[in-house]
Amino acid sequence: LMFALARQLPEADASTQAGKWEKNRFMGVELTAKTLGLIGAGNIGSIVAARAIGLKMKVVAYDPFLSPERALELGVDKVELDELLARADFITLHTPLTDQTRGILGREALAQAKRGVRIVNCARGGLIDEAALKEALDSGHVAGAALDVFSEEPAKDNDLFGTPGLICTPHLGASTTEAQVNVAIQIAEQMSDFLLLGGIANAVNVPSLTAEETREELVSLRGPELTGQQQAKPYIGPRPAIVTPFTVRLR
């Protein structure tokens, strides 16, 4: 999406297929030597940083959890959000949607951004104030935006639609044949690890645990039961079942 945004590819494609030849209309910009601002430098953000550095872009990152050592390893400058906004020619978002990140690019932040900035959001809808983004696009302060996610999905009716300089896609982030195959394999491996070994990975309601950690956790949960058995008088008859709720949902 960043390439498409930089070179106005969707507009150029539509124009050419309409029988026009507007070569001079679609003047793009190069990525080389531009500054990319990452909001979020976790797994995906770090991969984007590596790709951008390969394009000879300068990369700055805002992420409260990014250590100076990790920033040095990634080859990025760790900065505060206001500095990122002032320096970035392109901004990409790579953060979950939380109370702290909702509307992180709002009206005030967009006003602080460098004039002519281009914004890409393939992370989560709600990170950008869409009404404020439309105003910034209409005024020309933001030169372009490419969105794969929206505050409400499916986004069948959005005030942003039709705004010049805007590229929209229907949340295609993981929509490749290879990604779907890899997800299926990963889920099968995770279920196998849990059922055969006890390891838990990528659950949404419990921390990831190794097989050994899972065994230790279960021993801890059963501790009161075992203690009660040792102190109780002998009892002849059916043993009451003790059930520990333990539901694992996989991403």
Regions found by a protein language model. Give the residues of each.
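Glycine-rich Rossmann-fold phosphate-binding loop(s) that bind the pyrophosphate
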Residues: 41-42
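Rossmann-like adenosine-cofactor binding region
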Residues: 64-159, 175
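Active-site glycine-centered loops adjacent to acidic/histidine catalytic or metal-binding residues
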Residues: 148, 171, 197
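Short FAD-binding loop at a beta-strand-to-alpha-helix junction that anchors the flavin cofactor
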Residues: 159-174
